[in-house]
Amino acid sequence: MARQRMFLDMSCVDAARERIRHVYDTFDTVCVQFSGGKDSTAILYLAKEVHEERGLGPVKVIFRDEEMVSPVVVDFVNKVRNYDWVDMEWYCLPISTECWVLGRREHVLLWSGMRQRQGRLLREMPPWAIHAGHFGLTNDESIPEAIDYYTMQGKKGRTAFITGVRANESMVRFRSVVNKLNENYITRPYKLQKSIPLMFAKPIYDWVSADVLKFISEEHGAEWCEYYDLAAMVGGVQRVGIPLHSVSIRRLRDYTAAEPEWFDRLYECFPHVDAQYRLWPEFDVDSYIDDYAAEGWDGIKRCIDENMLTPGLRRVAMAYVADYRKKHVVDPVSYPLSWLVRNLVMNEFQGTSTRPVGPKTKDWKKKLAAEQAYSEGSGQ
């Protein structure tokens, strides 16, 4: 049953302060999951307030270094690491991520031992980092467990990682904070073993960007990462993180305009991203999709063969197609082949369930036209 939205008789900042105090009251160990972005910076200062109120000493902070992070962001995180009120754990673990170039996908291992031997790491691992060797692993393959399993090590009792997730950033993040009636902002990490007593807390889920920047600058007189100022000057994307996956790499020119030297190094390590930089503005996505969809299921197979460049991706794609095909047989209008191709080459399909074509898309218009043609043909 749907519930009507209720408004609080307090500001979003005061509400977040109540939530974060509740987190400290509820859990034995509380850590701030820090990325260098403005949202996690706001979380850091909210936690600082609680630590000063209660005399808890330095704030425990976790930073997951993903190697391809902007140099400006890395410098800011290192500056925060040296604050006397911060106790930071800096993790550099080998995790598989995606490199997407004009519809073609391949897995890339962060902090790869092979790329290190080839001199193709974007930068060297900092000497203070916690790395695979600390867990008896190597950098030649991805860590076997979810990363939260490793960052959780050494924490006592029930543990909460506080994150800067905000609901208005995406529908996925919105859904993550509306699934529970009580303590809706406290959730379990995705796919983490239930035996591990770790939860995520998202106390600023109802903030907007203006709330974040005002809180940092006016209430604490603090600074945020310089990257946001650089991005604002060039009209670039306001996001810190890896720029290689299927969504962020479409704004590669924004990252390049903000930090051209960083792109030079990215090009040295992954020369094929230059094709994305040069050709994306003229890339005809619809023709690319229609070319595969017109061949039916043979076109789907060709799409996988030509665009999934690593064996693991091919296996995941084939499983996704098998599930989609079952639904296509039952309802071909809601599950057209063009929508399947679009998900394979443009969207994030790994770890997601197959879904029908959604509104506000070109495939949705095709669906409506197909339904109308069927209705007219059947005389209804």
Predicted regions and their residues:
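Nucleotide-activated chemistry modules centered on ATP-dependent adenylation/adenylyltransferase
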Residues: 1-33, 38-380
